[in-house]
């Protein structure tokens, strides 16, 4: 059999590609909001009504929330800060690293450590921790200043993330507003306790680039406003 000749054709002037991103598909879509703002001139109110129809916006009182730090699941929590900080009332100097681990309910270890590769030495073995409203026990590190609205990174706590497959290797360091803690619930899980408004101040800039605000002669700011 002889292969058939290839059929030649002329490509169209416009090729439309339809698809979606990798998000959960619920609520506001950042790139969609940008398109409505820049290409259609929508205000942030119009964008919000499009994604959250039949709703009204209003002011709500700020409150504390606990945010699960999933990247640290079932791993020791390593915390440091440029300024002094405390763990359950125990003082640590700026630059020191504390390793927190949950052995079981009402049983936590607090070690001073040199980092991911160092198990450290015991500062408090078998700390009973505290009990939250759900009956789970936890311990918590707090910064020198409890004002979570500060922008000085030296005043914030920092999580040291170790490689899951090779725990002796440091992967990253990230600052957090508020306090950082370890909760025992059939395992050990890290959390960040912070005021909701301060949490949003840290999340929004990571989800949408600030450069969007200058797009479309400044119309992109409406997309950022909607996201915030």
Model regions and ranges:
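Conserved, single-site charged/polar hotspot
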Residues: 1-228
């Amino acid at each position: 059999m002889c292969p058939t000749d290839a059929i030649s054709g002329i490509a169209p002037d416009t090729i439309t590609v339809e698809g979606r991103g990798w998000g959960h598909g619920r609520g506001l879509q950042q790139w969609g909001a940008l398109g409505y703002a820049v290409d259609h001139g929508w205000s942030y109110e119009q964008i919000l009504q499009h994604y959250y129809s039949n709703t009204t916006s209003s002011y709500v009182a700020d409150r504390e929330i606990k945010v699960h730090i999933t990247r640290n699941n079932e791993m020791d929590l390593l915390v440091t800060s440029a300024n002094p900080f405390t763990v359950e009332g125990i003082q640590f100097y700026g630059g020191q690293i504390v390793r927190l681990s949950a052995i079981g309910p009402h049983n936590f270890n607090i070690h001073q450590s040199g980092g991911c590769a160092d198990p450290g030495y015991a500062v408090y073995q078998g700390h009973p921790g505290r009990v939250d409203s759900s009956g789970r026990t936890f311990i918590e590190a707090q910064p020198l200043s409890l004002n979570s609205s500060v922008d000085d990174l030296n005043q914030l706590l920092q999580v040291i993330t170790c490689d899951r497959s090779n725990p002796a290797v440091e992967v990253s360091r990230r600052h957090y507003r508020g306090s950082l803690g370890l909760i025992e619930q059939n395992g050990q899980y890290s959390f960040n306790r912070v005021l909701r408004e301060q949490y949003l101040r840290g999340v929004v800039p990571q989800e949408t680039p600030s450069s969007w605000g200058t797009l479309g002669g400044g119309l992109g700011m409406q997309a950022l406003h909607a996201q915030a």
